Amino acid sequence: MEMNNYLSEFIMFYCQNSVETAKNYRRANKDFIEFTMNRQGWSMDELVVKANKRDVLYYIKELESRDISPYSINFYISAIGTFFRFLIEFEYRSSSNPCENVQRLDTDGIEQKQEYLEEYEYKALLQVIKTREGRQRKFEFTSSRDVLWCTLCLTVGLRAFEALNLKVEQFNSDIITIKGKGNKTRSFRITDEIREAFNEYMKVRNTVLIEGQEDEGFVFISVTGKQLHTKDINKNLKKYTSRANISKDISSHALRRSCVTHYLDSGVPIAKVAVLVGHSSTSVTQRYYKSTGEDFDFLGI
């Protein structure tokens, strides 16, 4: 069986609840498979049967040579281990999981940057997104779309995959229910800021659809009319922050962290914030928190 067949079946049964998780698990395992097949001269079927702990350790060394962070390498190990658990459970492989006794890399003492935006930075970011000379149709579309994305992520703390899965029809109501991490549902209210950004975006959303092209109904689409990917929005965020002279590595997740930080700084109870952003406990919310001592009253909650 070909690599893509194994990976597709794996994704179908193990990553069905999250498009982003599926993409990341597929990418990690595809990289490991291609590296190991090339190093060992194996076919895919041979790798399924023969891969062992030594192959995983060689791959870890390869990742380290690429300057991949310990946090990311540990994710790769986890993704590979999950793939081999699938192979064993579906009886493609009879031997043990090659990741079973692989020690995770030590991340103690390694500071992971927890970037977030101050209020003035968020306003500057939105201003850059909205303003540009010679506003062409393509820019009108991406600008309005990205303003809505930032507003949602910062106002209600959506995860990237939660925002990507939103459908246009859900905005017919003032309350939106989403399916989040672990398949758990939660709801949020559409604030005036969100409604205004959504209405502006809807004025231009359909301009990128080609005549006869099927509209899948996702709120966030690319310039080709297909469902947007996180990497595309994060790429845009990097450009926007650079133009706004914000010297931080801002991603969609950083906007979510900003949401948590600013609500807590504004005095919103941590239990309420945890429910809003879909955290399993307030201890998770606390890890997101970085006190700024400033208010963020313009969010409207």
Which stretches of residues belong to each language-model region?
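Conserved catalytic core of the tyrosine transesterase superfamily
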Residues: M1-I301
